Amino acid sequence: MINIIVELSKYLMIALMLVYTFECFAVFNYTDEYTQRSIFRKQNVLMFLLHMIAFLVMYLQTNETKMIGFYGMQVVLFLAVILLYTIIYPRVSRLVVNNMCMLMAIGFIMITRLSYSLAVKQFIIVSASVAISLVIPVIIRKVKALSEWKIFYAIAGVVMLGVVIIVGRVTGGAMLNVAIGGFTLQPSELVKIIFVFFVAASLKTDTSFKNIVITTAVAAMHVLILVVSKDLGAALIIFAVYLVMLYVASRQPLYVLVGLIAGSGASVVAYKLFNHVRVRVLVWKNPFTVYNEGGYQVAQSLMAIGTGSWFGMGLFQGAADQIPVAESDFIFSAIAEEMGLIFALGLILVCVSVYMMFLNIAMQLRDSFYKLVALGLGTCYIFQTFLTIGGVTKFIPSTGVTLPLVSYGGTSVLSTIIMFAIIQGLYVLREDEEEDIERKKLQRRRTSRSGSAAGEPARRERISRPKEEGRREKPQQTNGWRTKEKGRTQPPKKRTAASERNTGRKKRSQ
């Protein structure tokens, strides 16, 4: 009986995911608030149903009551996120909130299936991150000096990355983490956000060649430190983000071309200098030939995706726990194996809809600084998603980055939730800009109406005065004579031939 429920559940979850994904893009076709709110409510129902079915299956498979309690805690968290954001900020983007909750729900499902203890840690991290993120939209909306701190952003980014080289710990062959008071922090995740603010502040108004050279030098310093730390994923993300933001700010394709050429040259140099780069390229070419020398992860990932096929094996029916670091870097492979490739494709489309919403907000912002920030964060998010999925599917060499909001990882989850909160703040800021525009239009209309209403009596008076004066002066200007009986002007009589003869006779007789 349990096997039947598990088998049916995977098809039901795929159907729910497809409908949810369809609604993510359908909402862009509507502009009226009533229809959009209806779609958002439907998305919430679909998300909670998918989440409930998955935890029901895991409870039946494990027969552990802690699954039920953990499920209830997650439901409370999702309700709190949806309600708090919509109550505190009534004008936030509901699509961004819904997609954030959906991605976190999928992450909780798969991490719980792989390791219950890690899932509990992830839940604590997400809860704390959400609490922190609630104040960020207020900061974005109220603090107007964010665009003036470019020197601070540059120094903070370089210092945070430099600290990792000095006191950092090696994780997975790369120097990524710093231990602070019993907690592990990955500075590169936070530096990505700081770097976006630095580039936006630097290029918001000044796109001169001199300023671009200075900004490029600071960006290159970030990338170089990350390459030395062997954090290739973060280095590629910062490189891609800078190229996109530079092109949008300057509108010069030549800069992008030069950047791509320089990046290609740097890649060749890195391949010659660093052994870990050569190993990853070799694994990318054919992971099965170097299975015992570094290709084990990618090979297991490809086999897991192939085993799951279109509809998946079902939760706890596959061997997802055999994939190395399946809860973080290779979580997409675990999802594809047990929940199916169709479900995994739906997950990709949800990430794409998040990126589209980021771009939509960026295009509607009028301030160049905020526009560049939204564009940079969107590029950071979608490029990290591309690196993660491309690496586990052997589309590109593996870079060791996590899938945002889905993979396990403390600093990664914190930085992504902060990123979403910044976007929400920019969305509210965009609504404020639209309100200001409408208010100014209304004021201009009222001013023009009051001005025309005040000028109308004066205009009528100016028009009527000459007419009245003309009427009074007409009797004085007439060439006729006034009769005593009627007191009105008579025109002079016409002179006829008979009257001329009588006049002549009178003159001769005189």
Which role fits each region the language model picked out?
Residues 1-17:
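Hydrophobic transmembrane alpha-helical segments in integral membrane proteins
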Residues 18, 394-435:
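Transmembrane alpha-helices of multi-pass inner-membrane enzymes
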Residues 22-40:
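Membrane-interface helix-loop junction between the first two transmembrane segments
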Residues 63-294, 333-391, 418, 422, ...:
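Hydrophobic alpha-helical transmembrane segments of multi-pass inner membrane proteins, especially
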Residues 163, 223-230, 307-312, 387, ...:
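Transmembrane alpha-helix interface/packing and boundary motifs in multi-pass membrane proteins
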Residues 305-342, 362-365, 369:
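Long extracytoplasmic/lumenal interhelical loops at the membrane interface
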Residues 431-449, 493-510:
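Short, charged, intrinsically disordered terminal tails
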